[in-house]
Amino acid sequence: MISFREMKDREYIPHKTYLKLLIGGGLSLSKVLLTNPGDLKKLRTIHGSEERYVRPKRPYELPPFKEGMRYGVTEEKYLRHTLYCNPCAPEVVALAHHLGAFQKTDYEFAKTAFEFVKEKLDLEICPMDPVEETIRRGTGTCFHLISVFIALCRCAGIKARYKTFAMNMIQTWYDAMVGSDQLVKKWYDQMGFFMMEGEGEAFIDGKWIVAHVGPTAERQAAGGIPITKFGESSIGVWFFAVPGTTETMESIPYGLGAGANLLKMIAPGSMERINISIQHQNKMGKKIIEDAGGKESYDAMTRKKLGSKTPIVDLSNKKGIIFGE
């Protein structure tokens, strides 16, 4: 049984900013549900004529784990086991060795891990579960995918942490992620932002290097933005951080998966519609990349005309949460 002191040391206990986000998100969702009972009844399930979500096939084989495989995990901060993120799990250790752990430089390995997670694992809105389940499944939320990157780095002896922030998003992703379901759209518009988004960071050669592993190249192409590389942040390109909400932490805090858990319990149909929309985005982006002549051509072309804008959301009456700089 983990002690309260250890929970606090490993940052399982939510920070003040996160608690504000969690409470504000819960109150906003409650208000949406209480004032829109008709929408909840209509949207909570998928009806017979609607498209159903089919999880994409995992595009990689699970490398075999062998006893005695080396791993660099210690009890040192940013190298140890944290909530949902066990760098000693056999699936993590085997995958880390498959990607070149202890054979490549720290930078080369972290970059390889970034590219694997970003391009091989796909976004799926689902409840939080351990990192090894994400590797077996091949899908997960942004925090599932970030946890895979962090676990791989820690397994290879590279310190890694989470960077979190409340965010709003570029218009195309707003349309796909939020506009696909009226209940989720009303929740987002009530708050003016989504509760929490994040990125991974790896400590290499004395500095923290950001790793935005959430979107595949195809989803970024569907959004009309460049394909982010290792060391490039999503903030200002894919997402826009709400001022005063950016934090770094060793672990996912308790309660982070509450939104997805609540959505699945109350309105599983809404969750399924979002996941269907994500797969439509992947298909759209794949064609855009093919028409552009490949990922490199698309990326070079898009970087020349970068100019994404946030969705227009009226925040004039959003008085529930105020964040300091």
Regions found by a protein language model. Name each.
Residues 1-111, 125-137, 154-155, 230-325:
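N-terminal accessory/pre-domain segments preceding catalytic cores
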Residues 114-123:
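Glycine-rich, acidic and aromatic/proline-enriched surface loops and short helix-turn segments
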Residues 115, 147-239, 253:
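Hydrophobic/aromatic-rich core segments of domains that either
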Residues 123-126, 171-173:
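Short acidic/His/Gly/Ser-rich catalytic and metal-binding motifs that mark active-site loops
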Residues 137-145:
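Secondary-structure capping and boundary motifs in well-ordered enzyme cores
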